[in-house]
Amino acid sequence: MAQTKREKAIKAAVVPGKAYAFEDAINILKTATKAKFVESIDVSVRLGVDAKKSDQQVRGSTVLPAGTGKSVRVAVFAPAGAKADEALAAGAEAVGMDDLAEKMQAGDLNYDVVIATPDAMRVVGKLGTVLGPRGLMPNPKVGTVSPNPGEAVKNAKSGQVRYRTDKAGIIHCTIGKADFAEDALKSNLTALLLDLIKAKPATSKGTYLQKVSVSSTMGPGVTVDQSSLTLK
């Protein structure tokens, strides 16, 4: 398929192998957006880890200061009482125990995040084959198993993103929408990278943040010059 003049101009704007200041990278992406919907701005971070080694796998979560721009539906497993009330007050769409598990087993899985209190994991554990393949299984490493479900719900709804290294040692994450202000996207990316630095495995050697690239849903990938970010 022949490229349009606009597509050729966008491709020409991205020099292979060149790292761009964050502001320039975002300007390229905003110029490249062409979908009829508001595209997401995503980031890929190549880490200096051996993802084949269990002690070098990086997994965690970050609450993005400017949010993700997405509406998040949350289900919470918590026993009736103060914890359940806390989750509902924080805005959870569904709260329960065995009753909620039965609904999920029957196919009610219209949730983006599932949270559980530690004492509810006996119920959630039975849903491994239902929640696991969808990436919804609660896990303490990403803050979705918590004794404070209200706080966990607020984090999920206010822009918490979860990440883990893939087989190539790369983290993939959304940092906002194409209609976000540049400063908002920059603060989100900075928060994510600072958390990744904190999560650096003790056995990781050499350069840790090897490459940071941003892209839009339908646009090109652009390498970011890390010196244009404040990572201290």
UniProtKB/Swiss-Prot annotation:
Pfam families tied to this protein: Ribosomal_L1
Assembly information from the UniProt record: Part of the 50S ribosomal subunit.
One Gene Ontology MF term: tRNA binding
Species assigned in the record: Stenotrophomonas maltophilia (strain R551-3)
Family from the record: Belongs to the universal ribosomal protein uL1 family.
Alphabetical list of PROSITE patterns matching this protein: RIBOSOMAL_L1
UniProt-listed SUPFAM superfamilies: Ribosomal protein L1
Name by which UniProt lists this protein: Large ribosomal subunit protein uL1
Stated role: Binds directly to 23S rRNA. The L1 stalk is quite mobile in the ribosome, and is involved in E site tRNA release. Protein L1 is also a translational repressor protein, it controls the translation of the L11 operon by binding to its mRNA.
Record flagged with keyword Transport: no
Domain of life: Bacteria
Keyword list, A-Z: Repressor, Ribonucleoprotein, Ribosomal protein, RNA-binding, rRNA-binding, Translation regulation, tRNA-binding
Xref: PANTHER family: 54S RIBOSOMAL PROTEIN L1, MITOCHONDRIAL (PTHR36427), LARGE RIBOSOMAL SUBUNIT PROTEIN UL1M (PTHR36427:SF3)
